[in-house]
């Protein structure tokens, strides 16, 4: 698998675009179009991928778990029906309560088997309740969905235990990941079979409880834990007034001060960039000249703003490496980036302790704790160009 900083900017490109990690509520899906013009909505695809859902949560029986598969095909908002076909999102789908009911019930017992056609989107699971997706008109007058935003207290889905995985399935293959970029709630595992047999996202025994306990006990982080329902990512916590907007400022300032007097080297697929802070901008020379303003704590946590990563092959990959270095707090200790030894991550007092906690919760140490977590391949991401099946498991908690 090609490392994140050596791919065209990754999670938003190959998996899903919902406004990046900083989706606001109500979140209207704006998934990136894929080359699927030959796939009419509603067709039963001969190359549909077998999708198996396994409820091993140990806390909820199958009757208490509901599935929602929503996303995009050829730029159009779609959802998977229980019959395995894609249906376009329509404003008329809203019921008397103002929301759609796109739930797919699990089998009465055992595994639930579905067929996944070419599309890009999310697989949501809701435990003990139903999710409320609202069909609305987007800026062009087309039907779109407002997605759950479990980190927003006023969201109608705030009280529902839920989580999701992300994927793109097209002629090139299956590209998928579990995600904790926005929050961590339900432990999910993905197994992708095909040319290889790969599993990612598996939370270790007791890992969920340990992550909740760790974050709850950290100064400045405790308010991110919502009962036993979810941990909100600190970027969303910042927007909600639950996390210090200047939390990382001392570390950011020290990075800026340090690299006023020495070089930082960043290696990407384009080559090696050498940078110094000049006039309060971190300017890199190399295959191209790129520069960045001093980021805020919010910019770092969302990997956006001053660290926005355009899909240009130069600025974007350097921004991704910087974003990962800030979140993992490796920029001062390692003047050559990216850092590839996980034992060097999160070793300072000021770091993304949320990302550290969710990585520690997984069996293989991989997680999507922030948007650039796939730099140096530490994200819970897998892909296969010849897939034969995808298995999503709600693991025990």
Regions found by a protein language model. Name each.
Residues 1-9, 20-29, 33-36:
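N-terminal secretory signal peptides
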Residues 10-15:
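N-terminal export leaders
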Residues 40-397:
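Extracellular low-complexity, O-glycosylation-prone Ser/Thr/Pro/Gly-rich "stalks"
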């Amino acid at each position: 698998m090609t490392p994140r900083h050596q791919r065209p900017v990754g999670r938003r490109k190959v998996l899903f675009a919902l406004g990046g990690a900083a989706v606001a509520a109500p979140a209207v899906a704006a998934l990136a179009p894929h080359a699927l013009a030959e796939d009419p909505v509603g067709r039963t695809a001969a190359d549909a991928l077998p999708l198996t859902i396994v409820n091993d949560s140990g806390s909820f029986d199958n009757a208490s778990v509901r599935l929602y598969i929503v996303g995009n095909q050829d730029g159009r908002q779609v959802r998977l029906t229980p019959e395995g076909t894609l249906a376009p999102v329509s404003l008329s789908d809203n019921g008397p309560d103002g929301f759609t009911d796109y739930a797919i019930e699990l089998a009465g017992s055992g595994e639930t088997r579905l067929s996944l056609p070419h599309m890009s989107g999310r697989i949501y699971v809701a435990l003990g309740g139903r999710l409320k997706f609202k069909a609305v008109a987007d800026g062009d007058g087309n039907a779109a969905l407002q997605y759950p935003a479990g980190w927003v207290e006023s969201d109608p889905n705030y009280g529902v235990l839920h989580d999701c995985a992300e994927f793109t399935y097209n002629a090139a293959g299956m590209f998928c990941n579990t995600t904790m970029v926005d929050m961590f709630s339900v432990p999910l595992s993905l197994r992708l079979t095909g040319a290889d047999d790969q599993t990612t996202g598996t939370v270790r025994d007791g890992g969920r409880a340990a992550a909740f306990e760790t974050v709850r006990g950290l100064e400045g982080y405790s308010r991110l834990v919502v009962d036993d329902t979810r941990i909100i990512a600190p970027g969303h916590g910042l927007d909600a007034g639950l996390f210090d907007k200047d939390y990382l400022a001392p570390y950011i300032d020290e990075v800026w001060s340090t690299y006023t007097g020495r070089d930082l080297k960043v290696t990407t697929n384009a080559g090696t960039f050498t940078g110094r802070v000049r006039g309060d901008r971190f300017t890199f020379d190399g295959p191209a000249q790129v520069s960045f303003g001093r980021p805020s704590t919010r910019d770092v946590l969302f990997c956006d703003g001053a660290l926005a990563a355009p899909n240009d092959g130069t600025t974007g990959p350097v921004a991704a490496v910087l974003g990962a270095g800030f979140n993992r707090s490796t920029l001062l200790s390692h003047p050559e980036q990216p850092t590839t030894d996980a034992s060097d991550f999160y070793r300072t007092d000021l770091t993304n302790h949320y990302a550290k906690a969710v990585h520690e919760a997984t069996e293989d140490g991989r997680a999507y704790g922030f948007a650039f977590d796939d730099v140096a391949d530490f994200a819970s991401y897998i892909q296969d160009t010849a897939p034969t099946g995808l298995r999503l498991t709600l693991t025990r908690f």
